[in-house]
Amino acid sequence: MNTPVIAAEGLSIRVDGRTVLADISVAVAAGEIVTIVGPNGSGKSTFLRALIGALPAASGRVIRAPGLRIGYVPQKLAIDATLPITVSRFLSLPRRVPQDVAAEALARAGVPDLANRQMTDLSGGQFQRVLLARAVLERPHLLLLDEATQGLDQPGSAAFYEQIEEVRQDLGCAVVMVSHDLHVVMAASDRVLCMNGHICCEGTPEVVADAPEYRALFGTGTRGALALYRHQHSHRHDDDCGHDHGAEHMHPHGDR
């Protein structure tokens, strides 16, 4: 495995006096795509928040590579419908972003023509891609996505996942994403973590799909049911087709 960009060692997190995560140990390598699945309340989003330093560890630790740049796509982001704000202006909050940098990020997210659109006029898929553009503004070494395809239909989700893979290839960044669907993960995932307050099992999608721990958690009928999102079409979704598909020492991987 390549040198990790981030790692959790014996990490436990408590929220409101309750242990949400217990003894999590996992390392993410440069360029690796890791997908996290698990039931609601299993600690998936909490784990991402701990990785970015938004939650303190009750025990254990998170080790980040020196100079690590992290891009984060949140689970939800509410925009006041009465607040006029263009995509370009949104990307410049809280500090101004040069126009060429914003244009590069939008192109990398697959929506190069949205700069002057109002945020409130975007479709679900367009909105998620703008959030992705914001996350890659500073060319991160690590990209974290919290249920980023929630609310998108299958074609929209598949197209978004394809864009994530392109970002990974372009930037050489590691990707850690939480999947809202227990049984569907991105086809390009190098590793899947099945989480329920702890790591139940991990491995390639094929290994996890057959793991007894996975079947015990989600039912005996789920054996081999961990499906993969693959983009099956040559055309682009959302914008191009006009449809709305959505209601102690580590070194970061260098930019490409």
UniProtKB/Swiss-Prot annotation:
Keywords: ATP-binding, Cell inner membrane, Cell membrane, Ion transport, Membrane, Nucleotide-binding, Translocase, Transport, Zinc, Zinc transport. It is a peripheral membrane protein. Pfam families: ABC_tran. Residues 237-256 are annotated as: Disordered. The keyword Metal-binding does not apply. Its EC number is 7.2.2.20. Residues 6-221 form the ABC transporter domain. PROSITE patterns: ABC_TRANSPORTER_1 (PS00211), ABC_TRANSPORTER_2 (PS50893), ZNUC (PS51298). GO terms for biological process: response to zinc ion. Its main location: membrane. It is an enzyme of class 7 (translocase). ATP binds at G38, P39, N40, G41, S42, G43, K44, S45. It catalyses: Zn(2+)(out) + ATP(in) + H2O(in) = Zn(2+)(in) + ADP(in) + phosphate(in) + H(+)(in). GO terms for cellular component: plasma membrane. Coiled coil: none annotated. It is found in: Cell inner membrane. GO terms for molecular function: ABC-type zinc transporter activity; ATP binding; ATP hydrolysis activity. Belongs to the ABC transporter superfamily. Zinc importer (TC 3.A.1.15.5) family. The complex is composed of two ATP-binding proteins (ZnuC), two transmembrane proteins (ZnuB) and a solute-binding protein (ZnuA). Part of the ABC transporter complex ZnuABC involved in zinc import. Responsible for energy coupling to the transport system. This is Zinc import ATP-binding protein ZnuC. It comes from Ruegeria pomeroyi (strain ATCC 700808 / DSM 15171 / DSS-3). The lineage of its organism: Bacteria, Pseudomonadati, Pseudomonadota, Alphaproteobacteria, Rhodobacterales. The gene is znuC.
